[in-house]
């Protein structure tokens, strides 16, 4: 309804190929949910998955707790970390120039132990493309300068630091162009604890 849409007449493109799922029945169910056209049959399929008295077995299975509140997620992750007997290692972000705390993509301080369940929070910027945002794994080796994660597909990844950029955009109305300038960076290992995550962080992930 914005005026800019009426003036620009944008071209709308619908993405209609699903890459993350291959089960046609599941894809159809997801489409019904997306289009608010859920049938009684599809609802019955979903309800079969509901187990009201379910209790995950501690450390035995790769269950992830989803919560609407960061405080609950942090409490669960802290509790699970404390239960691990391994030595803890702490890693600090490197922040250069202008990068306000409100823009931090993750905590400035990352503490890990061998056995910690983690999630990558950025796509691998190297040519190998070993991980992507949302990929899950377990920390299998740590040192002061290295982090090794074994992912759910058994791929072993030596994690390197990634850099997020704070980009300032300026427009040149005379030339009808937009210029970009990197005014700050945030560099850290792109991992977060993942025994529990917020529903917001889980959006778009496949478990």
Put a short name on every predicted segment.
Residues 1-207:
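Conserved ATP-binding/catalytic motifs of P-loop helicase motor domains
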